[in-house]
Amino acid sequence: CTFLGLDEHANDAFPVNCTSWQGASEICAAQGKRLPTEAEWEYAASNAPSEGAYPWGDDADVCNHAYVGRSSFAEGGSIACHDAGTVNDVGPSIDGMPGDLSALGIKNLAGNVAEWVQDDFALYDADCWKYVTFPLENPRCALGGDAQADKALRGGFWSASPFYARAVVRNLSDAKSPSAPAGVRCVKSWGP
């Protein structure tokens, strides 16, 4: 975990990981911000407005774009990226990869740490997704609110298979349990 305590600053340049959903929400609230919705996150990660497979577009050479598969225990049963960078069993990188950049100028959406989003995790045939009204305007799945056990995580992370770098891939974790790959990206709404 990158956070070592309030008085220890050795890892301040690293992205915060090992967060719970509640902890990530509190970090954002302390800054006057919030977690993005899944829809906002996916829009940013799909090379908007072009709707690519990855934040950088459709180039499938994930290992040379995103900080994923960098651990000797890369998850997901797919190809590891050890040959494209160093093995890191400890955690995220300070800078991620320079190629992991969206058209909106957002860095590290495909790799480094996975990111909590506001939404409860539910399959797309669940009620929270079935009854959305059209046109869609930032839909959010809220089955049980803050009490919901599983929350959605988006994006790849340093020990994940390159599969997780795709903008449309969803993951989940227990909202109350800190997770080593889980980090936080805060957003602020436009307007008043």
Role assignments for model-derived ranges:
Residues 147, 175-176, 192:
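Polar low-complexity intrinsically disordered regions
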Residues 179-192:
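Short, structured beta-strand segments at or near domain termini in extracellular proteins/domains
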Residues 100, 171, 190:
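Residue-level signal for short, function-critical loop segments
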Residues 1-168:
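Functional-site microenvironments in short loops/helix caps that host divalent-cation chemistry
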Residues 18, 177-180:
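Conserved strand-loop elements at the edges of beta-sheets that form or border functional pockets
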Residues 169-175:
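Short, P/G- and charge-enriched loop/turn segments at secondary-structure junctions
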